[in-house]
A protein has these predicted regions:
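C-terminal regulatory
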Residues: 30-34, 46-130, 135, 139-159
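A late-sequence structural motif
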Residues: 155-176
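Short hydrophobic beta-strand segments
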Residues: 1, 86-87, 164
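Residues that form or flank phosphate/diphosphate-binding pockets in enzymes
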Residues: 2, 73, 174
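Central regulatory/effector-binding core of bacterial HTH transcription factors
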Residues: 1-48
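Generic beta-structure capping elements
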Residues: 22-24, 42-44, 66, 91, ...
Length: 176
């Protein structure tokens, strides 16, 4: 959602480079993820032995909702959020617990909602009014600008960033 809109500009600047895009969900196993590829973009800490990483952006998470499904969104407190169906991404099992801990709310009282493998599906579910989502800010920019979704609070840093990662054997490869 954030990469493809930028590819036109990249190709204009670098017409000699051809990029093949494959989507995978990886869990810090950069070696297997890069097995058939020269470089990958992944989220993490940026520290993978045997690999070079270049930070692209720091991830910030936003609590978002559909204003049609939550008309009183302007009056929400972190404790109020726990009373609603909280949508989850399978790859981030503790995201909501961490968010509540940061806001001084006992996460054991939260109302866990459906789980989604893809963040794109979670965004669609939030837009459809199924619940409240905790989503990387960069992935919901269009929905926020259009008013389809609203942010309930200021974004918080997740502790993760997105990186361009490649094996050290490719460090002298010109396109990288």
């Amino acid at each position: 959602r954030w990469l493809l809109p930028r590819m036109h500009e990249f190709y204009a600047k670098h017409p000699e480079i051809l990029v093949h895009i494959h989507s995978r969900i990886i869990r810090e196993d950069v070696q297997s993820a890069t097995q058939d590829m020269t470089a990958i973009i992944c989220a993490g800490t940026g520290k993978w032995p045997g690999y070079i990483s270049h930070k692209l952006l720091t991830e910030k998470l936003l609590v978002v909702a559909s204003p049609a499904a939550l008309p009183d969104y302007r009056c929400m407190s972190p404790a109020n959020v726990a009373e609603h169906s909280l949508l989850n991404v399978v790859s981030r099992p503790g995201a909501w617990s961490d968010w509540f801990d940061r806001h001084g709310v006992d996460h054991r009282h939260m109302k866990s909602g459906p789980h989604f493998e893809l963040t794109a599906h979670l965004i669609q579910a939030v837009s459809a009014g199924i619940g409240i989502g905790l989503i990387p800010q960069i992935l919901v920019q269009d929905e926020l600008h259009s008013g389809e979704l609203v942010a309930l609070f200021e974004p918080i840093e997740s502790g993760r960033s997105y990186y361009l990662v490649y094996a050290t054997r490719y460090q002298n490869l010109r396109p990288l």
